[in-house]
A protein has these predicted regions:
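Short alpha-helical transmembrane segments in multi-pass integral membrane proteins
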Residues: 1-20, 78-143, 187-243, 299-364, ...
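Transmembrane helix-bundle signature of multi-pass secondary active exporters and lipid flippases
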Residues: 23-76, 140-147, 236-302, 322-330, ...
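Juxtamembrane/transmembrane-helix interface segments of polytopic membrane transporters
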Residues: 30, 34, 38, 42, ...
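Helix-loop interface residues and adjacent transmembrane-helix termini in multi-pass membrane transporters
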Residues: 35, 44-47, 81-84, 159-160, ...
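Alpha-helical transmembrane segments of multipass membrane proteins
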Residues: 35-38, 110, 152-156, 178-183, ...
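Small-residue-rich hydrophobic transmembrane alpha-helices
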Residues: 50-110, 147-166, 273-337, 368-391
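Hydrophobic transmembrane alpha-helices of multi-pass small-molecule transporters
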Residues: 62-65, 177-182, 207-211, 283-286, ...
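Short runs within selected transmembrane alpha-helices of multi-pass transporters and secretion channels
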Residues: 71, 140-158, 166-174, 195-210, ...
């Protein structure tokens, strides 16, 4: 059965939602990998192990986000060719993307294996958890090659409007991850190493499933292993879009690493509390990433078909959906977030501190929505550098400046993390201003 979707015609809000929900659910299951690790490690291995796993999050995200950005570049290029019905270019883009996944996966795996300890030490991870954190991070990076392959493969499917198959694969892999987590950590007592190995196995299963699907597809995006190679003109286009998108994603991680360094100074208990908060906070970021991916694919296909009026209508619709989700999640998590917190830890101090963070930060979720939607819209049109620049200024530079010059005068955890809503408001304002100029230049609006 053909599960691809042509975004160049049809009811916009229905198309976006039908495409969005499988991505959102898939993101939930992907997040479940690390969440299950955290729950099992926290309950079975204690607070120190929980803090060790949590302290690696920003560094792993820094690297992972870059290859996710590259996969975004591949997805945009394929979506544009798909909208333009250019079969030869689709074929070249698919095989170039897979080669890029293999090469980038190898590079990132080697980086993680050789530099994990030094990087964690540099951001101030306490020495009582440094060795465990380094072990977890090295084992996690063993999965970079299958992780890159899965992200590229699912990006190819989403580019042609298929968001359901990546969801099915993630559900299967999440089950695999939970089973191996339980066996390795709870039964065999392998600690955080067991949790990392379970994630590696799950990522490998994902990569195999998506590759098999592409190989046996009868559509224009069929993958032939013997034809995997770089097509330089297509590679250049993918990198021109994907590299800035990857850098933009890493900007968030760089800023968060700087903040994590300041958070680490408050001790192991605060690190554990923040780690739990980040897991709950991920629900919002999954929703934003899903609607961002949906609008990027939608715009990519319509840009390839030169349907500029439809692009503008799609952006407005996506923004309305994003704002609705942001407000709804803020209300739900502020009222019931404490129940989720108790899944991760039974320590009353951690539960109370985490709930305090939820009430302090989550009401401001709505202020971020313009960043995700306008960035995705511009990227779908092939403009990736300017959104990266705006994020660099509004997120990275401003957060680093805040914790360097302002928060030392307010030496509390909230004095550090208040930089999040401040930068959300600022960056959204920058995107609103620039998007008005972007519309005039690209659509004549």
């Amino acid at each position: 059965m053909n599960k691809t979707q042509d975004f160049t015609k049809g009811v916009i809000w229905k198309q976006l939602l039908f495409f969005f929900f499988p991505i959102l659910i898939g993101s939930f299951f992907q997040q479940l990998y690390n969440t299950v690790d955290t729950i099992i490690v926290g309950q079975a291995c204690g607070t120190n192990a929980l803090a060790a796993v949590g302290s690696t999050g920003n560094l792993t995200n820094l690297v992972v986000n870059f290859y996710v950005g590259l996969s975004t570049g591949a997805s945009v290029v394929i979506a544009q060719y798909y909208g333009a019905h250019n079969k030869d270019k689709i074929h070249q883009a698919v095989h170039t993307s897979y080669m890029l996944a293999i090469v980038s996966g190898i590079i990132m795996m080697l980086f993680g294996l050789f530099f994990s300890y030094q990087c964690l030490d540099a951001i101030g991870v306490p020495h009582d958890i440094l060795n465990d954190a380094s072990l977890y991070m090295r084992l996690y990076f063993l999965g970079m090659i299958p992780g890159a392959i899965y992200n590229i493969g699912s990006g190819i499917l989403r580019a042609v409007g298929d968001s359901k198959r990546p969801l099915y694969y993630l559900i299967i892999c999440s089950i695999v991850n939970v089973v191996f987590d339980f066996v390795l950590v709870v039964i065999l007592h392998k600690g955080i190493a067991g949790a990392a190995i379970a994630t590696f196995i799950a990522q490998t299963v994902c990569a195999i499933l998506v590759t098999i699907q592409l190989m046996f597809s009868k559509n224009v995006y069929q993958l032939t292993l013997s034809k995997i190679k770089f097509h330089l003109p297509v590679l250049k286009k993918i990198v021109q879009i994907g590299a800035p998108a990857g850098i933009q994603s890493t900007m968030y991680s760089i800023a968060n690493i700087v903040l994590q360094t300041h958070i680490n100074a408050f001790g192991t208990q605060t690190i554990a509390s923040w780690s739990v908060y980040v897991k709950i906070d991920a629900l919002f970021w999954m929703a934003m990433a899903a609607i961002g991916a949906a609008i990027t694919t939608f715009v990519g296909q319509n840009y390839g078909a030169h349907l500029y009026d439809r692009i503008q209508k799609g952006a407005k619709t996506a923004l309305a959906i994003a704002l609705t989700m942001a407000v709804s999640l803020s209300v739900i998590l502020c009222f019931w977030g404490s129940y989720i917190t108790k899944l991760f830890s039974s320590d009353p101090a951690i539960i109370n501190q985490c709930q305090s963070l939820i009430l302090f930060l989550m009401p401001f979720y709505f202020s971020y929505c313009c960043v995700e939607i306008f960035s995705g819209t511009m990227r779908g049109c092939g403009e990736s550098f300017k959104p990266m620049l705006l994020v660099c200024i509004g997120i990275c530079v401003l957060r680093v400046a805040w914790v360097t010059f302002i928060s030392p005068h307010y030496p509390t955890l909230k004095g550090v993390v208040i930089s999040y809503p401040i930068t959300w408001f600022t960056t959204s304002f920058l995107f609103i201003i620039y998007y008005k100029h972007f519309k005039k230049d690209h659509f004549g609006a």
